[in-house]
Amino acid sequence: MKAGFLNGKLSTKQVILDAKNIFHNARWFNGIVVCPYCGEVHKIYQAKDGSYSYKCGKCNTKFNDKTKTLLHGSKLSIESWMQGIYEVFTDNFITSTQLAIKLHINQKYAWLMLAKLRFGLLQDDYLLSGIIAQDEMYIGGSLSNFHYERKLRLLRENHYILPNERKYDKSAIFALNSKLKQPVFGLNDGNKIVLYATPNPIKSSYIKKVVKKHITEGISVADESKLYNDWKQETGLELSTNNHHNNQYQSKDGYTSNPIENTFSWYKRGFIGVTHCKYHQLYLNEFVFRYNTRDMNHSDRFREALKHTIGKTITYKDIKQQKSIFKTTKRNELSLEEIKSMLETGIVSEVIQNHQKYTKESFK
């Protein structure tokens, strides 16, 4: 294989014509084939036809370059995969329908390819340090833009109004808005970012767990949220606070959380299309990878993306069965009489404060 494919610039034509060699060199370090099942190095026999198919002399297992990678078990050719990876990471955000047209494949195959690639871009290896800005954002449409009948249905399902009631208070809309959206917690140290879709409602314990995983040392910069109470005791990091309610956007030490807020703004503007909250972490993985490799050219980013396909396997069943972190915790039962009395005494506000106690069974 020519050195240009390893270090130089690549074009779509080059990627397609030499796809097998490109993936082979990315798959095996220094060209040394290792059995993915038992780790044998010496007794590896290649197929006589010269293809990239092998047999291990130790465990008698047959394998190829796609074994134990994101391409494992895929019916698509290596050429289609290499072109797909190149198209995804050398262009702006691309949808499965656009990718299907470029690769001349079914949209379902293109969707699965995108899902696998995004799954492979895990954020576990990113370590941040220095001055780290952190904040939360909420992704999703505003309830005020929903059709009137849909608003009523959602308000009834979440027990902000009684069954068959057709009037609602604006405070109920405001409270339900945050509940229907997907929370995202982010970190930005000025060089790299980390974004995680969190359970709704967002919890302080989850945030501190993410911070301990990704921040080695430094100073955290955040707003006045209660999520950051007992910060230094539980994370070991200094916390600099900006009180946004008092129009304070820079702390006394001169630190600001604007970098992560800018990141959220880029994400909301850049990710346009049909998305589902169940797979939102996959979209965040792609955005984080693009941001953290923004200084690379297209060819280097393509090679970096190839590294994330190695040693990871996932099937369509795994993707569809993954649990949605968007789901809220189950609420305790409350009788219809109790809800009526609460509405009579506290109108809507008290119901909003206690909405986590209600379940749909209360109205049956």
Q: Where do the PLM segments sit?
A:
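Residue-level recognition of single "structural anchor" positions
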Residues: 1-364
